[in-house]
Every structure is written in structure tokens, then in C-alpha cells.
Amino acid sequence: DNAPLWDEFNPYLYDASVKLVSGKSTSLTTETFGLRDIRHEGNKLVMNEKPIFLRGTLECCIFPLTGTPPTDEASWEKLYASAREYGMNHLRFHSWCPPEAAFNVADEIGFYVQVELPVWSVTFGKDSATVEFLRAEAKRISKEYGNHPSFCFWGIGNELQYDFNILASMLGEMKAADDRHLYTTTSFTFEKGHGDWPENQDDFFVTQWTKKGWVRGQGVFNQELPSFDKDFRASIDGMEVPLVTHEVGQYSVYPDLTEIPKYTGTLMPLNFMAVKEDLEKKGLIDKAPEYLQASGKLAAILYKEEIEHALKTPGISGFQLLDLHDFPGQGTALVGLLNAFWESKGILTGEEFREFCAPVVPLLRFPKAVYTNNETFEA
């Protein structure tokens, strides 16, 4: 009853060894595991009887030097360290499952992981062979990685559309086979009649909006004057499971041309090279650092407001940024304050970012961004 439990603040691990002796033969196996109780109480995520808030970003299998994810723990230690430096406690593996090393490190440092099957499809269920492969893959993932305490959340895939009856059947099978995780049908969907409220079997709900309104700044910042006394509570009123905001941000930063020499492996930065060539032709190459800083500072302000909006909202259980680092997997998406190598672009330090993204964040509500000297500031 008094055994230490695993969480982000106390990632306590145990080793269990089993030895089988038969005549002159001996077999020994050791399993590392953690004890934790994760569930939801209404719209709150609860870990070991305490509410948790996910401060997350995506990992979209972005490894520019190799094109494949690393299988050594040192590489994952570096990646997780960068995420934690910027206040994160959660990674969503977007439409893929990482290798064993990623789970081992997450276990050791206390990171909450969301895994997905390798699918991002607008025709889910149309091809029966694909569905059967994914069913089998779910069983393999559960068998190989399911006992890791960091493996807290599981979704079938990203923005899935088409046959929600098959999705429901598949999620039911996954939940019945393995109750060590919390499950969601899909990380958001554009399917008509879905995506704005949880599916019946969802333990948590990942979305951009609900049937009552937006839960990320995309539908707010472009429509309203800056204000700091609002939140998304009207949009989640009546929500009965925890809500995590989907792919928050996507604020572009000008290319950091000093990044070009870093690409020494499988990926060539042709987009960066084209921008550099264009600036040189126009005699503007000296302006590139200024463009980076100006666009980056705006992106940082917007990310800050996104995060604080979520933190201010009772009933929101976390956010998943797109992205803390750049996303070169879908054209050019320089949406990160870190580059594709999880390295700083010099826009905002981790210490500065943690001022608004951390386990404890002071928040203030006030109605506008600009005041004159003859006004009284009330908050």
C-alpha cells in the first residue's frame, strides 16, 4: 500500500526478476516497471489521485540526418531534455509508435506519452486489409510496450475519417485487451458529425473545437482584439471527459539560414537554400537574422497566449503544440521556436518559455493589451 508511485515528479521504477531452474538449465528474466493509477474523473485527468495537466508537443518522426528514429537511449535523452527545458511533460507521437529506447527514457525521467497506430487517413475502414494490419499492430504494440508507465495515452491515429463504426469496434477491442492506458478514437477529425464532441468510448478527447466553439487561438486571435480575461470555458461546458487541445499554434518563423550546414545526412534543405539564394539575388541576405528574430518573437507571443488561454480554462486537461520544433514532414512548416534538430533558434530560452509553461504558472486576467497613462490598470 505504501509503495512509491510513478509520475512526472517522482518517476519511481522497480525491477522484478524471475528465475526458472530446471535440472542443469537456468533461465533468468528481469522486467522494469512503474506503479501508477491513471484515469479520468469527469473532465479531469487524474494520476495517482492528483489532477494532471499535459504540457505537450508533437513528435512526427522527424530525424533529418537519418530519416529513421534512433534506437539508442542517448538520442532520446537529448530529445526529451530539450522538451523538458521548455516546460513540457508530454509527447504525442503523431501517427506512429516509437522504439523501446523512447519508452525507457520517458519512464526514467517521468514523461507522459501518447502513442498512435501508423495511420492518418480520410478513408479509414475502406480497405479491410489495412484495418486488419492495424488491429494486429495494436496487439503487437500492447505486447511490446504496454507495460511502460510512460505509455499513458493511446489513440488509433490522426484526423481519421470515413467509417466510425469500424473505429468504434477497434477501439473497443483495444480497451478490452489492455486497460493500462487511456484511449481516444482519433486525435481530432474533420468527419462531418464527429470531432466536435467525444465518441462514446473516449477516455479523453483531442480536438480543435467543440460544438460550442473553438478551444485554440485560431478562431479567436484573428477575430477579436487582444484581451487577457477570457478563456474557452463556454466551448467545453458539459464536457464529460478530459479535453486536450489539438495541434495548437502552427505559427511560422522565418527560415534560420544558419541551419543549412547542419543537414549532413539523408535530408537536403532545398527550401532553406532556395530562400538564401532569393535573398542574395535581392540584396537582402543581411536582413535574414532580423527576419528570423521579428517573426520568431511574434510566434513566441502567440504561443504564450495559446498556452495561457488553455491554463486559464477550468476543464481543459492539456495542450499538444504543433509544434515546439519545426515540422519538415509536410512541405515547409517552420512552426517551431526550436529547429528540426530540437535546438534553439535563439528566439526564446527555455527559462523564458517556462515562465508560462511549467507545473506552476502565475496568471493574471485583464481586459486589453494597451493602456494610456490616465487609465487605472485593474486585474
Predicted segments with their positions:
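Secreted/periplasmic carbohydrate-active enzymes, especially glycoside hydrolases
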Residues: D1-H94, V105, G110, E137, ...
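Substrate-binding/catalytic cleft of secreted carbohydrate-active enzymes
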Residues: A81, H90-N339
